[in-house]
């Protein structure tokens, strides 16, 4: 009789504890769901990431990239740019270093030495001056591409400045940028880093319940033309790169009216 009582007591205790654990797990799941829902206003979510043709997506705290080992650079870099991020902190400029998160190894900065090309940021350091860690993270070699100096400091700089203007206008934008790699014949350095003939940049913003975008395709050379002369459709860039830039946003169109 005593043995039966003990067995019943142990069984009740077991199921009681199990139910308590299950309740806690449900609460945690609900809390996690709540946090997830609270973050849906941010454009910087995986829902906005382009597809990767290389399957090597590298996530840093403030930007994400898809690394293309064959060309020794990212095929795209994507990041959120908020109006609140636009600061002018005088951070000390760090040295470029290899990206420890790139499993195949990102190119050494010495490939650019005496090449005649700038180490052109894809996610600009100037967009990340709100935080020292964010700023320093832009100096990984996975975030650079060979750019002609007149291009880097000229027309491309004007596109970057306009991007910051749009961040202020819309308060929060999403940027995807990179080089057109598949037709890049010229290489630099011992690791044969490809030199893109063109660079692209897509800016996405939310206007009410709708999304709107503008896309640029700019030759890797200086130009005195208006940046609007280089506006193209997102479909044009997708055909050139094989990348689906916003797979979760159906019927997204880009235009000069941004």
Where would I find each of the regions flagged by the language model?
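Sec-dependent N-terminal signal peptides
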Residues: 5-14
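Domain-level detector for secreted/extracellular nuclease and nuclease-toxin modules, and
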Residues: 17-258
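N-terminal secretory signal peptides that target proteins for export/translocation
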Residues: 1-2
């Amino acid at each position: 009789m005593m043995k039966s009582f003990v067995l019943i007591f142990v069984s009740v205790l077991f199921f009681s504890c199990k139910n308590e654990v299950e309740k806690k797990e449900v609460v945690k799941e609900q809390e996690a769901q709540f946090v997830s829902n609270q973050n849906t206003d941010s454009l910087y979510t995986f829902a906005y990431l382009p597809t990767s043709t290389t399957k090597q997506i590298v996530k840093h705290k403030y930007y994400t990239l898809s690394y293309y080992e064959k060309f020794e650079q990212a095929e795209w870099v994507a990041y959120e740019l908020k109006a609140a991020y636009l600061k002018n902190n005088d951070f000390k400029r760090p040295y470029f270093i290899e990206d420890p998160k790139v499993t195949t190894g990102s190119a050494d900065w010495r490939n650019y030495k005496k090449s005649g090309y700038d180490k052109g940021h894809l996610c600009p350091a100037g967009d990340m001056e709100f935080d020292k860690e964010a700023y320093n993270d832009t100096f990984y070699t996975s975030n650079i591409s060979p750019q002609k100096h007149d291009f880097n400091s000229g027309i491309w700089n004007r596109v970057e400045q306009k991007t910051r203007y749009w961040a202020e206008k819309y308060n929060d934008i999403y940027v995807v940028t990179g080089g057109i790699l598949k037709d890049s014949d010229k290489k630099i350095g011992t690791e044969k880093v490809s030199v893109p003939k063109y660079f692209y940049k897509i800016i996405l913003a939310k206007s009410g319940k709708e999304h709107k975008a503008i896309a640029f395709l700019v030759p890797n050379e200086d130009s005195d033309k208006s940046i609007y002369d280089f506006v193209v459709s997102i479909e044009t860039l997708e055909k050139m790169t094989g990348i689906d830039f916003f797979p979760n946003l159906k019927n997204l169109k880009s235009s000069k009216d941004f």
